[in-house]
Amino acid sequence: MRKWICTLVALAGLTGAAGMILSATDAHLLPDIRVQRAANLMLIHAVAALALCGLALLAPRRGGWFASAAGALLSGSLIFACDMTLRAVHGARLFPMAAPLGGSLLILGWIIVTISAAATLWPSPGGTGDQNTEK
């Protein structure tokens, strides 16, 4: 699990870097609202994925769910942002229905976040939940 989380952290770093590159592209080379939105989308979801990776390490019983949410957010933001950027630069799509697929992965990722957080509060069968013992 730890290697998977480290891989997600590395991918989040690359996603954040790509978001910054798109921000610079929007500011200096190709001022287009689609490029700006793609940059913002990548930056926001890179940070969210980093936070989810931290939660995955802190809540080991539910860590796989937090890591899955991070993976869905990163893949969704990559597909969605690439499609928007290609439309701005070349007037072409990444592939048919790429933006809806990317958006659906983003929605799924956020739903997994919600379910994972709620499940962390519930006790596991025969044990306690991952939540802190403080009341």
Question: Where are the regions that the model predicts?
Answer:
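Core segments of alpha-helical transmembrane spans in multipass integral membrane proteins
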Residues: L14-L22, R34-R62, G71-C82
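Membrane-helix boundary connector in multi-pass membrane proteins
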Residues: D83-A98, S116
